[in-house]
Amino acid sequence: MTKKVFIFSASTGAGHNLAARSLAEALQGRGYDAQVYDAFKESSAALNRIVTKGYKQLVEIAPKLYEQMYHQFNKMTPFQQNIFKVMSKVMNPEIVPLIEKEGPDLIISTHPFVTNMLGTLKAHGAFNQPVLSFVTDYKIHSVYLHPMIDAYVVGSEYTKQTMVERGVSPDIIYPFGIPIRTEFMDAPSEGSEKGDPAVRGTIMVM
């Protein structure tokens, strides 16, 4: 029987969605039924506008304020935790019935907000499937961290170490790298295709 995987992301910057699509493509190529969902778009139109458009406008118009908010949420005080509890309740009406109806074998998140909210929903008994978080940032942010997340895939040993320093068990952190599109996996450089000995390889700037 084909294993079913749900991959949740959010449209705050293209990177999280691109990672989700890259994962789905890789899993589908290995025989999994992998589906990508925008967690906010699938749940609440109002929340989706606030998170996606609000994020974009904040970064463009008030980058200093965004920086302050970034560092404030990195502390994850009870106040910040309560915000995510409220957000998880807004997300709940559509996401949880979808999980109950389709019964995925694994749930993956490529976005820190979604990771935290899925952990909160799982903590309240909304579902019991394992949740895997793909950390698409090299420097960990506290929003990614939730005790109900079963495993993390991170981009480097450095990221793993910063998570261990914050109390996450090293046994559930896997420094396998950040997902990329399959066409980049074995893409030869233009020079190497032409047999240019001066070209040693291809560098992808992220």
Which sequence ranges carry the predicted segments?
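Conserved N-terminal ligand/cofactor-binding loop architecture of enzyme catalytic domains
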Residues: 22-96
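Active-site and donor-binding regions of nucleotide-sugar-utilizing enzymes
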Residues: 14, 19, 72-168, 172-175
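Short, well-ordered secondary-structure micro-motifs
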Residues: 47, 144-145, 185-188
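N-terminal glycine-rich, Lys/His-bearing helix-loop that initiates the first secondary-structure elements
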Residues: 9-12, 17, 26, 30
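Extreme N-terminal starter segment of soluble prokaryotic enzymes
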Residues: 2-6
